[in-house]
Every structure is written in structure tokens, then in C-alpha cells.
Amino acid sequence: MKSTNLFTLLLFVLVLSSCKKDQLDPSGANCDAMEVSNQSTHVLIEQTGTWCPTCGGEKDEIQEAIDHHERVQHMAVHGGDDPFANDRTQDFRSAIIRSPYFPTVMGSTDPSFMDFLLAEAPDMQVKLDVKRDGSILKITAKIEILGEYECARENGCGVFIDGQQVNVFDFKSINLGIYLLEDGLDYPQANYGPLTHNDVMRDYLTEVVTGDQITDFGEEVSLGDTFCKYYEYDLTANNYHENIANCKIMAIIVEGNKCETTDTEWYLHFLGSDVFEVGNL
């Protein structure tokens, strides 16, 4: 009888422990308890270089946009002969920013248009939680569907054959990009002078630079659906940054599009985003 009771007690403890483990992701954050904002964010992706003679003025315009609204978020991707460029930023530029011209900003900096976008309720949004264990960052990202999201639409690809538009479907997927950014990087800007560079992309944490795929192309999602992804990042092994106190993690929902006539992504659209200051840990 005693052995039976002991077995029952051990079984209860094991079941209780497994339940707690399921509720807690590796970062120590309870994904179910993470509250995703129902407000839109506006993402500005800047292609830039310290050597670029016209990029200083573009940075002023971007800073005005950031100052205009607290929900404008920015990532600067440096390229060329630049102290803040590396193989990881080149991956990003090659995959996402196809224009060879400088400066290039993906996303509007017009105040009135930003106000219009930010007043709209988002179809989805992402929330970050970051813990630090020594040199390891443990990151939880939660995406929640907040509105009616269409995974396919007719005529979205705009394919023409013999001058006539073909009725094809544009299938969408939801991707999640996680990036390491750094503030407070001092370096002169060409034709501008001394400048402190902020929101500088240093590395990406996902397997794919354009973001890990959360849903398949055309996979239907419903209001209230949530998706959680977990990442670990070793600050010692990945020493792209200069000062971890000035670093932050940025999560971006990247919408991928694909025509039914091709197997490759042909368009990427930046949706919701969230930023977590690593220096606060």
C-alpha cells in the first residue's frame, strides 16, 4: 500500500513538473502570459554607409520620423567599405535590399502618412521577452493574429502573358526576423562630419536572414492564433557588437509573398515589430 501511494505521489510530481515545463519556454518567459500590443508599429529599414556623401541628410530625415512618433522603429544596415558592415549585414542587403543606390529607406518617413498607418489596427503584432544568463541571451518572440488576415488573393502577382493579365494567386507566409542592433557608434559621416550612429544592425539570430517561416505559403490563420519562437544567442561566440550595454534585440514580422507560378519569394513586406533593450538586463 505504501509503495502504491509513493508511486502515485511520484507520478503526480512528474505530471506537475512536465506541465510547468510546457508552460515555460527556454528563456524563462511564459509565452501564454506575454501580452502582445494591439497598436501598429512602423518599420524603417535604412541602407546606408559612413562613406555615402548623401546619407547624412537621410539620417536627419529618419531621426525626425523617429522623434515624430514613438512607435516608429528603425534599423540601419551598413554596407560597402564601412566599419559597421560585416558578412551578416551583407547577407541582409543581398536578400532584402536589392537597390544598388544610396541612400535607400524602406518605409515612409512622411509624418502624415505615418500617422495614417499608425492609426490603423494591425493584422498581427509581435512581442519580445529577453533574459540573460551570463553571455547567453534567451529570447522569446510571440506573434499574435489580431485581425482578419488573408493568406491568398487573386491577381496579386500581376503576371502578364501576351499583354493580358493572368488570374493567378499571390500566396503569403508569415516570417519572423530577429536582429541584434547597437546604438552609440561614433564615426564620421562623409560630407556631414562627426556622427553617432544608432540602430545599427550587427547580426541576425534566425536561421534565414529574411526571417524564419512561421506559416506555410497560403496557410490560413484565424483571429487569436499565436505563434512562439525561442532563440539563444551567445554574445561571446558572436562578437559583432562593441558594447553590449548599447545593444538591443529587434523582432520584425516579415510577410513573404509567392506567385502560384513560381516557387520563389518575390516580395517581402515588413509588418509589426518590437524592440527589447539588452542593456536593461
Regions found by a protein language model. Give the residues of each.
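Bacterial Sec-dependent N-terminal signal peptides
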Residues: 2-3, 14-43, 280
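Sec-dependent signal peptide hydrophobic core
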Residues: 5-11
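Alpha-helix termination/capping residues and helix-transition junctions
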Residues: 13, 68-69, 99
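Mature extracytoplasmic/luminal segments of secretory-pathway proteins
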Residues: 16, 28, 49-52, 154, ...
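Secreted/luminal cysteine- and crosslink-motif detector
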Residues: 20, 32, 53-56, 152, ...
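Local sequence-structure signature of Cys/Sec-based thiol-disulfide redox active-site neighborhoods
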Residues: 30-73
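Short, conserved sequence motifs used for protein processing/export or organelle targeting and
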Residues: 73-281
